[in-house]
């Protein structure tokens, strides 16, 4: 090596590791099945893979008044409303009774919550079952009230696809059930646990270097 030659430290040549993805499970309760329908509850949890199981790091829930949905131009689907009337009393009251907010505030609060979860350069993963339902309806509601969303179409992940892949890899554990079905937050919690358990299972199948 000449006097002008020098070697860079190995660490300087290696890219800095990316921060882990911010994983969020989203669940909506609605009065329709198409974009533009009324959103009556938004539930979400931030979850992570830790040790032998998942961990819930943060939670979000807003229930929304129908009056505000109507004022925003969101519609009510009669068959969906009739379906709600057949659900257990606890599910109905958890969504349609108690303290509720308007759809403007709900969309603003949710997008701010998602934005505040992020870290610089940390990828965002928004999970749903399926995203074709929750993503499109949530984005339509946000658009109706003029709230920009802090995610792109590549940020969404499909729990149903993960379920199929894990099953093909031999996953057979029973699913975690929500403490109260059709409660947006309870559904999001259960779905987060089910996603995390499958992700951990698939990780265990990857050969160690």
Report the location of each language-model feature.
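Charged, flexible boundary elements
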Residues: 2-15
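Conserved non-catalytic scaffold segment of RNase H-like nuclease domains
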Residues: 13-24, 29-128
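Acidic active-site catalytic centers that drive phospho-/nucleotidyl reactions
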Residues: 27-29, 134, 158, 187
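Residue-level signal for well-ordered alpha-helical scaffold segments within enzymatic catalytic domains
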Residues: 109-112, 116, 136, 140, ...
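Substrate-recognition/cap helix-loop segment adjacent to the acidic, metal-dependent catalytic center
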Residues: 114, 118, 132-154
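Acidic, Mg2+-coordinating catalytic module of metal-dependent nucleases/exonucleases
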Residues: 125-131, 136-137, 171-209
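Active-site catalytic pocket residues across diverse enzymes, especially alpha/beta-hydrolases
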Residues: 142-146, 166, 198-202
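Short, flexible loop segments at boundaries between secondary-structure elements
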Residues: 150-170
